[in-house]
Amino acid sequence: VYVLNSSIFNMYGGEISGNRADAGGGVYVTRGGGFNLSGGQIKENEASSGDGGGVLIDNGVFYMTGGSIDNNDAESGNGGGIALRYAYFAAISGGGITYNSANGVGGGICVSGGSQLTISGGVSIESNKAFLKEDQDERPSGQGGGIYVGDGGKVTMTHGRIWSNFAKSSGGGVLMAG
């Protein structure tokens, strides 16, 4: 699903699965678009060379109040489940982000480019993995199994659970890199 130019995608149920793209394997939001996830599944999608195996928000807005983002992969990028780059605003207040992986940073969620993420409610960020890239270029990798925050990103968490995540390098649960 590609959302741009102030369009809004509301997902109340159903499934987005088995898709592959360079970036934003399941959902890619850019240029002021928005995505509201309140039910359904985003699962088993892949970003083959960029960020956001399940969801990529690049200059857009994201709200998650329910549903799940599971078993997605950023094969050569960041944010296996969700990648937030220059997101205007993002809030997660329900649902689960589980069993995602990235061969970069942020197995579950990557927050970068000054993006702001608020986590509240009964959110579960569980069993996500950040692996080391094989090519080992200058960018960090293997950090922030559950959540990676870098490049001016900000996360505020008032409730939720981050558990049983893995990072090959550092920050199994969360890595805050500035």
Identify the residue ranges that each predicted region occupies:
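Conserved acid/base catalytic micro-environments in cytosolic active-site loops
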Residues: S124
